[in-house]
Amino acid sequence: PPRMPCKMERYFFYLLYLLLGCSLCGCSRKQAPKQTQDPDTETTIPYADTIAAPVPPAPAKSRTARYLDSLGFVNIAEADSSIAIDLMYTRADNFTGTLLYEDLKEAYLHPDAMKSLKRAQRLLKEQYPGYSLIVYDAARPLSVQQKMWDVVKGTSKYIYVSNPSRGGGLHNYGLAVDISILDDKGLPLPMGTPVDHLGREAHITEEAVLVAQGKLTEQERENRLLLRQVMKEAGFHPLPSEWWHFNRVSRQTAKERYRVIP
């Protein structure tokens, strides 16, 4: 009869079976094909939805603007961004024919004048929601006033410019503004003359005569009246010789209560 394996032999075969089984399992794991994914079908993380686009830095303020900030004057664009700004003395196409603001690119006012200007803008928009005030000049350093005076002294235009040696004008206190109105398309309302026109046609005291003479249309006169209405109601006073110029206080009051900008 066949010989039955002894106890030791059975134990040996049992260990051999275990070793072979473990070896086969290990090989199976090592040789298992690696799962790969076609790069064309890989899912990508939508970075654009999770990472905000970088915000461009705000333009650096000019040296003069920082100085006006330190004196407590108010940047018009920061106080009311709905008011348009186009400083005419940052270009040479003004009555002097020269660039007067080499550094200043921002429009500033004294806080008292800024408060009234914001009210004027609000009054205008209550009547014409699509309209806006546009500022052509505001606070003006006395050093710039001197440049302007040097251009006109000895000419017939000197009567339109305040002499800096006598304290300058209300612009030099941040208490005057040169201003007009934009329509709902962003275009300036016709006023009969450009801003900064030094001549009789810009005088507000002769508008009826100018209309009668055909030098000013009735619509242009009405546009001027609208500008004066909102500015006066807000606390400004018009300058008789310039339809665009408005003062917040008198020159005497400015000298007594306010500080001139050097």
Question: Predicted segment positions?
Answer:
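Extracytoplasmic cell-surface/polysaccharide-interacting catalytic and binding patches
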Residues: 28-138, 148-151, 155-241, 250-262
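Sec-dependent N-terminal signal peptides
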Residues: 14-21
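Positively charged n-region of N-terminal signal peptides that target proteins for export
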Residues: 5-13
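Short, well-ordered surface patches within globular domains
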Residues: 144
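Conserved metal-phosphate-binding beta-hairpin within the catalytic cores
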Residues: 246
